[in-house]
């Protein structure tokens, strides 16, 4: 029974937390991933994230190619629902996740001295993510494994694929769906700093990745081609108590050139900084709140600009945890 109680406490600390943006950031603000997303938990765990995001700036928060108009003033309210399944791949920890964005986006554009307005609402492009650990601890397969878990230094392989199924209007440039296949390959790294004490857990997390894009053959009647976008995300996370933690977040993104109807425009760089706060409500329910903003938000600037606020709630469950809870409660 002592093992069951210890595992219950450990489960509260290590419950799987999703917040998106990931994706997003291209699912939640240009697909940037929330801190602690790639912490490992018991294989076989199921998780359902629900994410709400509000973003503003001059770039579509659902387009990681950063195809933007400096004169634009955009606002987006996005909700994201998903499902994730932790599963071993051979002797390695793995995960398969699906995320579906929905909501509305609108914006004003200055063209020829006059102001025009565009808007889009409905579903965005769904994303599928595959994750496999390359370096790090063995998969957490049972209760004793969970008690012994420490991330140490771990590195994963992540492959994302976004399907062109979202709302798209070929008469305008602003859409929830992007009308093309695109995806990401990356290697997220989690580095444990110091001892793994529940109320003082500290990690440095780094995620280099590259986005690859297919062609959009009907971008306002023309063909849009985008070179790869390179991203580097970093998070320094720290527990303040056993249930409450925070993170300092930074993202650097360098988009490739875009070619529309044979005319090429140069890519742009963007640096965002912000914070995330997380709270483990109970062993199966987690809450995160985060904010990020580009460093240069001067009015009239030709730089990429974005402000993003996100809140997420994630629930998770596993048959072993549920069984342990029933035994510990005498049910």
Question: Which stretches of residues belong to each language-model region?
Answer:
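Residues that define the transmembrane beta-barrel architecture of outer-membrane proteins
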Residues: 44, 73-81, 121-128, 153, ...
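Surface-exposed strand-loop-strand hairpins of Gram-negative outer-membrane beta-barrel proteins
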Residues: 55-78, 113-116, 170-175
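Outer-membrane pore/translocation modules
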Residues: 104-226
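Residues on the lipid-exposed face of transmembrane beta-strands in outer-membrane beta-barrel proteins
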Residues: 50, 80-85, 128-134, 159, ...
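Outer membrane beta-barrel transmembrane domains
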Residues: 61, 216-331
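N-terminal signal peptide c-region/cleavage motif recognized by signal peptidases
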Residues: 26-28
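Short loop/turn motifs that connect adjacent beta-strands in outer-membrane beta-barrel proteins
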Residues: 36-44, 87-95, 136-154, 194-202, ...
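Transmembrane beta-barrel strands of outer-membrane/channel proteins
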Residues: 48-54, 96-104, 155-163, 202-212, ...
């Amino acid at each position: 029974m002592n093992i069951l109680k210890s595992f219950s406490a450990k489960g509260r600390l290590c419950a799987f937390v999703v917040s998106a943006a990931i994706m997003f950031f291209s699912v939640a603000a240009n697909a940037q991933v929330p801190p602690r997303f790639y912490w490992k938990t018991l294989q076989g765990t199921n998780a359902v994230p629900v994410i709400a995001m509000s973003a503003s700036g001059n770039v579509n928060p659902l387009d990681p190619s950063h195809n933007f108009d400096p004169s634009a003033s955009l606002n987006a309210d996005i909700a994201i629902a998903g499902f994730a399944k932790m599963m071993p791949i051979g002797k390695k920890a793995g995960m398969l996740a699906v995320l579906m964005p929905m909501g509305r986006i609108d914006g004003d554009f200055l063209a020829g001295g006059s102001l025009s307005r565009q808007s889009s609402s409905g579903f965005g492009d769904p994303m599928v993510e595959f994750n496999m650990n390359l370096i790090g601890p063995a998969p957490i397969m049972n209760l004793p494994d969970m008690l012994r878990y420490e991330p140490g230094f771990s590195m994963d392989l992540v492959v994302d694929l976004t399907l062109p199924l979202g709302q798209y209007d070929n008469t305008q440039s602003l859409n929830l769906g992007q009308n093309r296949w695109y995806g990401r390959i990356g290697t997220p790294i989690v580095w444990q700093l110091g001892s793994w004490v529940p109320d003082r857990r500290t990690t440095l997390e780094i995620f280099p990745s590259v986005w690859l894009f297919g062609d959009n053959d009907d971008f306002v009647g023309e063909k849009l081609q985008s070179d790869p976008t390179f991203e580097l995300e970093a998070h320094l996370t720290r527990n303040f108590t056993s249930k409450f933690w925070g993170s300092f977040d930074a993202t650097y993104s360098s988009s490739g050139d875009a070619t529309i109807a044979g005319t090429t425009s140069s890519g742009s760089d963007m640096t965002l900084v912000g914070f995330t706060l997380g709270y483990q409500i109970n062993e199966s329910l987690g809450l995160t709140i985060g904010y990020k903003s580009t460093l240069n938000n001067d009015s009239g600037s030709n730089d990429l600009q974005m402000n993003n606020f996100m809140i997420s709630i994630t629930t998770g469950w596993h048959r072993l945890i549920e069984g342990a809870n029933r035994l510990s409660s005498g049910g």
